[in-house]
Amino acid sequence: MKITKAEVDAVALLARLELTPEETETFTGQMDAILAYVEKLNELDTSGIIPTSHAVPVENAFRDDAVRPSIGVENALANAPDRVEGFFRVPKVIE
């Protein structure tokens, strides 16, 4: 499959990237090489391979919940530039 400059421009638009003509040319070649490699992988016989989502078995890695002491409000706010009633005060970001 041959990638065109128009396709690279379309992907750049979706990614909100502004590419120079030189970058478009470079990425066209790179994307074409990537897809050529994927096409080569499609030639492999995978009929006896079971589909998987992980290469190795994954088990739940979470630990049991345990109540432990925390650093406390005063220590957490010790270096806060501004605080109010035990909370961080931050600039308003919603208009």
UniProtKB/Swiss-Prot annotation:
UniProt key word Glycoprotein: no
Catalytic activity field: L-glutamyl-tRNA(Gln) + L-glutamine + ATP + H2O = L-glutaminyl-tRNA(Gln) + L-glutamate + ADP + phosphate + H(+); L-aspartyl-tRNA(Asn) + L-glutamine + ATP + H2O = L-asparaginyl-tRNA(Asn) + L-glutamate + ADP + phosphate + 2 H(+)
Gene3D superfamilies listed in its UniProt record: Glu-tRNAGln amidotransferase C subunit, N-terminal domain
BP term (GO), one: regulation of translational fidelity
EC class (word): ligase
Disulfide bonds: none
InterPro entries: Asp/Glu-ADT_sf_sub_c, GatC
GO MF annotation: an example: asparaginyl-tRNA synthase (glutamine-hydrolyzing) activity
EC number(s) on file: 6.3.5.-
Keywords on record: ATP-binding, Ligase, Nucleotide-binding, Protein biosynthesis
Pfam family, one: GatC
Assembly and binders: Heterotrimer of A, B and C subunits.
Family, similarity comment: Belongs to the GatC family.
Function: Allows the formation of correctly charged Asn-tRNA(Asn) or Gln-tRNA(Gln) through the transamidation of misacylated Asp-tRNA(Asn) or Glu-tRNA(Gln) in organisms which lack either or both of asparaginyl-tRNA or glutaminyl-tRNA synthetases. The reaction takes place in the presence of glutamine and ATP through an activated phospho-Asp-tRNA(Asn) or phospho-Glu-tRNA(Gln).
HAMAP family: GatC (MF_00122)
Record's protein name: Aspartyl/glutamyl-tRNA(Asn/Gln) amidotransferase subunit C
Taxonomic lineage from the root: Bacteria, Pseudomonadati, Thermodesulfobacteriota, Desulfuromonadia, Geobacterales
